[in-house]
Amino acid sequence: MDSLWGPGAGSHPFGVHNSRLSPDLCPGKIVLRALKESGAGMPEQDKDPRVQENPGDQRRVPEVTGDAPSAFRPLRDNGGLSPFVPGPGPLQTDLHAQRSEIRYNQTSQTSWTSSCTNRNAISSSYSSTGGLPGLKRRRGPASSHCQLTLSSSKTVSEDRPQAVSSGHTQCEKVAEIAPGQTLALRNDSSRSEASRPSTRKFPLLPRRRGEPLMLPPPVELGYRVTAEDLDWEKEAAFQCIKSALQVEDKAISDCRPSRPSHTLSSLATGASGLPAVSKAPSMDAQQERHKSQDCLGLVAPLASATEVPSTAPMSGEKHRPPGPLFSSSDPLPATSSHSQDSAQVTSLIPAPFPAASMDAGMRRTRPGTSAPAAAAAAPPPSTLNRTLGSLLEWMEALHISGPQPQLQQVPRGQNQRSQTSRTSSCPK
């Protein structure tokens, strides 16, 4: 026992570990293991190779004798075991053979143990209900049989391969029995489910025994639907659509500006103001023309009526009509009507009137001219005709009927200079 905890156990990487984990072994086996580890029991092991370890310990890591050094050496940090580090040198073939044999044994054991546990899969599905009673009765001999195989495998056998093969055959028999048991259990479970009463609280169709199955009558309308009803429904739908469209059109028309009425009103105001506007440029042109005729002493009654329309458009370009009377969208009708109205006004002027009387009447009505200049340029009263009163009355009637337009203001000094130059050039 001292050798287990002594330096001999420390020489082997798994010695201390296995001695601590296997307290259930018999004392004789413990002594044999200690002798194997110390190297003193090698001849005994050669003499009696049939002594085997407990098969339950084969799942642990195999032990290596003292003669065969391990391929791994432990690294110790602070007295504790740490991961093993491989030692230098080639691995021995004996270790490979032993490990392959142990792996084969482990796989065989796991195969038959897994086949034994697979038989209880159905009982695990009924774990919530505690399992079926028939299942427990049938499971009894199978479980005892499996326990017998385990106990027999735990016993020490003389030759290991025969024990392993016997365990394989026993487990194969158990596996052959297991499918039939599962089929029988499934049949029992289906029969038990069929024998269970229905637990639905509210049946789908109320039915009594001995009465035929009657379906409820279908839903019926309170009135009869005819083709007229369908036509009325279509008309009502069309009316709803039309009313919606009319409301939309009305809203769109309300949002649009009232442009046509505005243009008509502007045209009407422009037509009413055209005669008054067109008279002013023609009068200005006639005033200049009559001034030149007064200086020369010539009277041409027909020439004034024929030449003024040609000069009227040019005077119209100089004197722009005021903005509020015309719309910006239609300037061409205003100019054409302006020229036509100027021609009409010039044709309305009486031809036999002398130039001096016309000039005097225009100067009297013109607000821009000064009084001294008008008095200097005015001819003596002896040259006026009898029709001067009628001309003045006609001019006053024109001013009363139409608004007086705002004429282009000529600078005062320039107007006086032009008048003085013209009067000085006239023969005295």
From Swiss-Prot:
Biased composition (Polar residues): 118-129, 144-155, 260-269, 326-347, 403-415
Disordered, as annotated region: 1-23, 36-204, 254-293, 306-384, 402-428
Pfam families for this protein: POM121
Compositionally biased residues, Basic and acidic residues: 44-62
Domain of life: Eukaryota
InterPro entries in the record: POM121-like_prot_1
Family under the similarity heading: Belongs to the POM121 family.
Name of the protein described by the UniProt record: Putative POM121-like protein 1
